[in-house]
Amino acid sequence: MSRVVLVTGSTDGIGRATARALAAGGMKVIVHGRSKVKVDAAIEQLSGELPGAELDGVSFDLGSQKAVRNGAAQILERVPALHVLVNNAGIFAGERTVTDDGIELTFAVNHLGPFLLTELLMPRLLESAATAKIPSRVIDVTSIAHTRGRIHLDDLSLANAWTGYAAYAQSKLANVMHAHSLAERHPPASLLAYSLHPGVISTKLLRQGFGPVTGATTESGAKTSIRLAGEEVASEPSGTYFSEGVATQPAAAARDAAARAALWEASAKLAGL
């Protein structure tokens, strides 16, 4: 049976390049996006490029906890096994917006939604690891911007200190801390968790957040996710952070065990777990 991977935000950009490469390599890929129209179009295009590829799709908004719960339920109903979760989707907001759950949009989409999704899918990931006798993977796509981030535990929605970059950097630091916390919570025989900076890549997010900046190709940005998702034997310990494919020490804030525990507790409370 093919190994199964869910790649969030895989209708375009790095996520699509990741999904394409993993499908080409023989994995069953679940394409995810907020729009069903875009998910269906991506699957149709990938099917044309990769005859015989095993593809499925799911659409839900990571910024809505209700939508995340419904999306996770769809996945669990339709997919009996799940071996890899690539938390790739992300945004850079141009203005401060609060979701229906009362959470600042960047934090909701980039961290809290993936946090909730990961926990809802975790039992299936662990079951699949036991059956396959290969550790399942959670891969969080973050950014070098995490080094400029600060976790505002008393104001995670940044009501008093919002800028687009501050919100983005906080969410990317949370991604690194999330992967490290997963590595602490699950034995490596069952789960391997990683975070990675893909490089400065020509994506919609780069243009929205940083203007007309020249970046590398999406295929280049997908390389680390593809390697970590596809390898049967782990090349690096669980919890490792990669920068452009190289295992690297993350920011000091991400290495603070007490801060990671506090973020986990706050995230679980906000997500209703």
State where each predicted segment sits.
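The beta1-alpha1 cofactor-binding region of Rossmann-like NAD(H)/NADP(H)-dependent oxidoreductases
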Residues: 36, 58-73
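A glycine-rich helix->loop->beta "capping" turn
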Residues: 50-54, 74-87, 93-98
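A short, exposed helix-loop element centered on a Lys and neighboring polar residues
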Residues: 118-119, 180
